[in-house]
Amino acid sequence: MYVGYVLDKDSPVYPGPARPSSLGLGPPTYAPPGPAPAPPQYPDFAGYTHVEPAPAPPPTWAAPFPAPKDDWAAAYGPGPTASAASPAPLAFGPPPDFSPVPAPPGPGPGILAQSLGAPGAPSSPGAPRRTPYEWMRRSVAAAGGGGSGKTRTKDKYRVVYTDHQRLELEKEFHYSRYITIRRKSELAANLGLTERQVKIWFQNRRAKERKVNKKKQQQQQPLPPTQLPLPLDGTPTPSGPPLGSLCPTNAGLLGTPSPVPVKEEFLP
């Protein structure tokens, strides 16, 4: 229908009032005219009209977010006008409806003293009583026992030998400064010590002996000769015999000069 209307309208392109029979179209039927064609873009081709379809309206989408609300105007109120503004500096502060959240109360001195005073107290009534300082209790018990023979220093235990143990160890050291493995086992079993304790005692005893011998050698060495002090005027004092004693004949030659013979001549 629309094609027939175009063919009938474009008479310069298709001359003749009748349409060609080859199209096989029925009798012309008239429909209400469509939108007016756009004017030709090129004046040389006036016979060809450029028909553009009507643009479809853009789809309407629902807004994903609601329109912003001016809540700040209700909370803070309208701002001052230009005429009512004062030249005073602006003061920044919290809004009228601002309420600070109170901080949780910290542990007071009473709670801290209670926690320090009872380190082994359980966290809950149903929890078993277990102290976190078990290693300290063991060290205190080991150090406080008088019969254990051990004292605790800063970082290690120090063995305190009895008089009988020291006497037997000194006897063994008198015979041999380096103890054998077999003798070390026997001494440890007889004195109630471990083999490591016996070995350490011999190491310390050898170090002590070396220190004593070195001190004796330093005391027995003769002192180096000391230099004579200089006199007050700064001239060094001669350390050898006087020069006159080295040449005794020079003093006699200078003191008593030898007589010179005089030859007398007489005139006739």
Swiss-Prot record:
Ranges annotated as DNA-binding: 154-213
Predominant cellular place of this UniProt entry's protein: nucleus
UniProt KW keywords: Activator, Developmental protein, DNA-binding, Homeobox, Nucleus, Transcription, Transcription regulation
Domain of life of the source: Eukaryota
Pfam families for this protein: Caudal_act, Homeodomain
SUPFAM superfamilies to which the protein is assigned, alphabetical: Homeodomain-like
Annotated Gene Ontology cellular component terms: nucleus
Subcellular location: Nucleus
KW Transmembrane helix (keyword) present: no
Biased composition (Pro residues): 29-42, 54-67, 92-108
UniProt GO molecular function: DNA-binding transcription activator activity, RNA polymerase II-specific; DNA-binding transcription factor activity; methyl-CpG binding; RNA polymerase II cis-regulatory region sequence-specific DNA binding; transcription cis-regulatory region binding
Region (Disordered): 1-152, 209-268
Annotated stretches, region: Interaction with DNA: 157-178
GO terms for biological process, alphabetical: anterior/posterior pattern specification; bone morphogenesis; pattern specification process; positive regulation of transcription by RNA polymerase II; regulation of somitogenesis
Feature: compositional bias, Low complexity: 73-91, 115-128, 229-246
Signal sequence segment: none
Tissue distribution: Intestinal epithelium.
Region (Interaction with 5-mCpG DNA): 196-207
The family this protein is said to belong to: Belongs to the Caudal homeobox family.
Protein name, per record: Homeobox protein CDX-1
Annotated source species: Mus musculus (Mouse)
